[in-house]
C-alpha cells in the first residue's frame, strides 16, 4: 500500500515514478515538485518514463512529465515526439481537424496560444457560418462532434495537472449549485463584479485559478457555456 508520507529524495527513480503513476490524487499532487526536481534521475529510465501511462487517456501525470522534460530536457521531448508526430497523447478527429498545434502549445505551456487554437477549433466544429462570423452560437453546440470535444477536454486536462478543461469547469459549477454568477469569480473570469479584461488580465499559466481555461466568450451569455458543459459527450466524462 502506498504510504501518505511526504515526498523524499531517497526514493529511487523507479519508486518515484511508480508512486506518481499509481498514487491517489493527493499523493500525486504532493509529488509534483519532486518530479520536476528529479527529472534528471527520472530521464535515466528512458522509454520506461512514460510506459505506465495510456496514450489514449488523459492522465495529467504523463502530461506533467512531458512539460517538465520540455522545461529542462527539451531534446528528450524532441526524441519522444519524433516517434509520436501527432503528439504523445493519441487523438482522433471525426471531422479531420489536426490537433498537433493544440497539443504542442499545451505541452510548451503556451496557454494563451492554446486558448486561441481552442476557440478556432470550436468555430470549425460549429460550421462555416460560425467561422465567418467569428464566434459560436449556443444553438450550434448540439451538432458539434462529441469525439472532438472530448479530444479538446482530454488535452486540456492532461496538460494542466487536471486543473483546466470543460469537465473541470462543469465540476466546479456543480459544486456551486449550478450558479454561473458564482462560477465566474471562482475561475477568474470576473473580479470584483467586473469581467476580466482579455487577454492581459488573464493568467496564462499553471498558476491560474482552477477552471480558468479554456475561455468561452462570456459576453455571449450563459447559454453558450451551458450548452458546451452539458454536451452529452462531455457529460459522459464527469
Segments predicted by a language model, with ranges:
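Hydrophobic/aromatic side-chain positions at a characteristic register within alpha-helices
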Residues: 20-23, 94, 106-107
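Alpha-helix N-cap/helix-start positions at coil->helix boundaries
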Residues: 22-29, 43, 55-59, 63
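Eukaryotic acidic, Ser/Thr-rich intrinsically disordered low-complexity regions
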Residues: 58-92
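C-terminal-biased regions
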Residues: 70, 80, 88-96, 100-104, ...
